[in-house]
């Protein structure tokens, strides 16, 4: 637009109104309205959780992350294919104001190192493998200090922000934390401490970094907020006329935009 020229404007519908709420607030409302309704089914793990059970597991995971030192604004990476732990971590990080970093399970060491460093990931949750990729061996390649890791604590020259490792598999090679450790550590965080953290949150807070496909260069981190994700879900639900009687099957990967949003 040239100086002094006509103004441009966009005219469209003003409704429905956007929701100014956090993901945790939306989950809490759903658990109150439909406590015995099924919230999550993970067939390959034999998991079936009601909304009440799911909210309880999310709170436990949130407390576990707080116990290992995850603060508001910290980046928590998850390097795994679709599983119960992925979904719990997604909602738990949102509940404590952390930012979930989605990491493509198919990444090689080069892409992994880039994503962890570029995002400033503080805590990484990871599985044992994906197809022919050995995740622990790949981490050792980009972060040799893993061999000296004690109780999940890490100091890395190549990844200066990375402080905690949580293994989602079995037969861990080093002194990493495992998923069950988070559940145990959660007992050290009171309900009041979790509520105080949640009271700090606003719907404009960033809660997710998704990486683009990187077809023209390195993947770029896209930041999403509570506002983005809650209202995206609202409009999808409205356009599909979804209700509490419907079930949604998500076969696509959680790490990218379709599965995550």
Residue ranges and their predicted role:
Residues 35-38, 158-162, 166-167, 173, ...:
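Conserved pre-ATP/AMP-binding loop-to-beta segment of ANL
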Residues 62-63, 74-75, 81-101, 105-109, ...:
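A short helix-loop-beta submotif of the ANL/AMP-binding
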Residues 67-70, 238-242:
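Glycine-rich helix-loop-beta junction characteristic of Rossmann-like nucleotide cofactor-binding loops
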């Amino acid at each position: 637009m040239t100086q002094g020229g006509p103004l441009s404007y966009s005219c469209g519908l003003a409704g429905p109104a956007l929701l100014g709420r956090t993901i945790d607030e939306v989950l809490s409302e759903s658990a109150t309205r439909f406590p015995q309704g099924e919230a999550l089914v993970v067939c390959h793990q034999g998991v079936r959780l009601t909304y009440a059970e799911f909210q309880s597991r999310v709170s436990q995971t949130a407390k576990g992350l707080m116990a290992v030192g995850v603060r508001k604004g910290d980046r928590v990476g998850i390097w795994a294919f679709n599983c119960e732990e992925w979904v719990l971590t997604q909602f738990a990080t949102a509940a404590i104001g952390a930012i979930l970093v989605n990491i493509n399970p198919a990444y090689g060491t080069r892409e992994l190192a880039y994503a962890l460093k570029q995002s400033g990931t503080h805590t990484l949750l990871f599985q044992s493998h994906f197809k022919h990729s050995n995740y622990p061996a790949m981490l050792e390649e980009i972060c040799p200090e893993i061999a000296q890791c004690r109780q999940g604590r890490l100091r890395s020259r190549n990844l200066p922000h990375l402080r905690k490792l949580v293994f989602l598999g079995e037969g861990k090679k080093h002194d990493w934390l495992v998923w069950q450790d988070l559940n145990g550590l959660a007992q050290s965080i009171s309900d009041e401490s979790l509520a105080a953290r949640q009271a700090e949150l606003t719907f404009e807070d960033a809660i997710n970094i998704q990486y683009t496909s990187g077809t023209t260069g390195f993947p770029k981190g896209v930041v999403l907020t509570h506002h983005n994700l809650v209202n995206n879900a609202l409009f999808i639900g409205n356009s599909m006329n979804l209700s509490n009687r419907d079930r949604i099957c998500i076969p696509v990967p959680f790490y990218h935009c379709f599965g995550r949003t």
